[in-house]
From Swiss-Prot:
Family of the protein in this entry: Belongs to the Diels-Alderase family.
Protein name, entry field: Diels-Alderase ucsH
Coiled-coil features, chain-numbered ranges: none
The organism's taxonomic lineage, starting at the top: Eukaryota, Fungi, Dikarya, Ascomycota, Pezizomycotina
Molecular function GO labels: isomerase activity
Known function: Diels-Alderase; part of the gene cluster that mediates the biosynthesis of UCS1025A, a member of the pyrrolizidinone family that acts as a strong telomerase inhibitor and displays potent antibacterial and antitumor properties. These compounds share a hemiaminal-containing pyrrolizidinone core fused with a gamma-lactone, giving a furopyrrolizidine that is connected to a decalin fragment. The polyketide synthase module (PKS) of the PKS-NRPS ucsA is responsible for the synthesis of the polyketide backbone via the condensation of an acetyl-CoA starter unit with 6 malonyl-CoA units.
Protein localization: Membrane
EC number: 5.5.1.-
Top-level EC class as recorded in UniProt: isomerase
């Protein structure tokens, strides 16, 4: 019998269950309801084989923007057309239902649907992370897209679901303090067919799906992030680098070759923004640690397209190395197009998503080329954060409602 979780737009729970267990079905809900700043989202992204088009969909249960008076059920759809134009739209829905139809052997599906009058967006994700399908039916957009996995599901420390099951172990779902996630479909082949305001968007490419949940709002748990997903020849690559509020970087990486994991790990390291205590603790930990893994994102400049805010990088070098295996994998990203962009109160903070190229492989071996989707975010701090939320409040008071997350170009 299916387990069902139902959430309405303005429903607030008195108490919630917050699961961090890797034994839970990959895409099933981890938060029983919304209380305070807890949030949960199902995130899908993609890029066409030619690197010109892309689709990003976020289905969230999130109180971060309740100041707008629109509830906690947000759906963001960001579309990049072949000619470089965009459709960025946010819907605030009335109800979200997630059904766990999985079995103990990871068969079955996790089904979700966000609805409002005349609107529905639904997903169906295989319990084992092998495939997913999304259907969109709104006045602006109608159609569907599918994903077929190229790599097995992965947890932040690099464990795959198959490894955990075969070894009878559990994994941590925590990427950084308060934020948890699982790469349900790290990389996949992608097929999309959407009609967006009368414009047909149909392409094949690569994509993936991440399920994330947290005990605090984005603005209070991380200073920002850099994430990428790409496929180059036989290699599938993901990297997620988040900086916590203490200035400590948590960088999770994954490299798969022809469906077989070659690297998976989490590196945590201090930065100049970190406290002296944190720097010392991490230094002593690393000195004692054997088999150290390195997961690094190094920005590059003057190679491609940059966003409008403070981070002017136009690409990155991703490097994954393991002291145990002695192997190093290196991939170069180049940003070629903007998928979407939001500014957060100043020119120094914002979020830019990119479509672009990736090339690389194992050091000393053949170099492969492909496509990648990535995004770079710097969240506002201090007075800038306060100013950002004051602007949202003024927009609501003055105009009744402004969809600040929506930009169409």
């Amino acid at each position: 019998m299916a387990r069902i979780n139902r959430q309405t737009a303005y429903q607030k729970a008195q108490e919630i269950e917050f699961s961090t267990s890797s034994a839970d079905p990959l895409a099933a809900w981890r938060i029983s309801g919304i209380k305070g700043t807890a949030w949960e989202q199902w995130y899908f992204d993609s890029i066409a084989d030619d690197g010109k088009s892309g689709i990003v969909l976020t289905m969230a249960r999130d109180a971060s923007y309740t100041v707008l008076g629109r509830g906690v059920l947000r759906v963001e759809l960001d579309v990049t057309f072949e000619d470089g134009s965009h459709h960025n739209h946010v819907d605030w829905m009335n109800e979200a239902i997630v059904e766990d139809r999985s079995s103990p052997k990871s068969t079955g599906t996790i089904d979700g649907v966000w609805t409002a009058p005349g609107k529905s967006i639904r997903f169906q994700i295989a319990a084992d992370g092998s495939a997913a399908k999304v259907e969109v039916d709104t006045p602006e957009t109608k159609g569907h897209f599918t994903l077929a996995a190229l790599s097995p599901p992965m947890y932040p420390n690099g464990e795959t679901q198959n490894e955990l099951e075969s070894q009878g172990k559990v994994a941590s779902t925590e990427l950084l303090p308060k934020i948890h996630l699982v790469q349900v479909i790290p990389t996949a082949t992608f097929e999309g067919d959407l009609m967006v305001n009368g414009r047909l968007l149909r392409f094949r490419g690569i994509g993936g799906h991440m399920h994330a949940w947290a005990q605090g709002a984005w603005f209070d748990t991380t200073l920002g992030w850099k994430v990428a997903r790409g496929v180059a020849g036989p290699f599938s690559v993901t990297l997620m680098e988040y900086t916590d509020m203490e200035g400590i970087v948590h960088s999770s990486g994954y490299v798969v070759e022809d469906g077989v994991k070659r690297f998976g790990g989490l590196e945590t390291y201090a930065t100049p923004r970190s406290s002296a205590t944190s720097q010392q603790v991490l230094k002593y930990r690393d000195e004692d640690r054997k088999g150290k893994q390195t997961v690094r994102w190094t920005p590059t400049y003057n190679t491609g397209f940059a966003g409008r805010f403070g981070d002017s990088s136009t690409g990155a070098i991703l490097q994954f190395s393991s002291a145990d295996s002695g192997e190093t994998y290196r991939f170069e990203l180049t940003h070629r197009r903007k998928a979407f962009e939001f500014l957060f109160g100043s020119s120094d903070s914002g979020l830019t998503a990119f479509l672009g190229e990736i090339k690389g492989g194992k050091i000393g071996s053949e170099v492969y080329e492909g496509v990648q989707a990535s995004n770079v975010c710097v969240l506002p701090q201090g007075w800038t954060k306060i100013y950002f939320f004051i602007c949202m409040l003024l927009a609501v008071v003055t105009f009744g409602y402004i969809n600040i997350l929506e930009t169409n170009t």
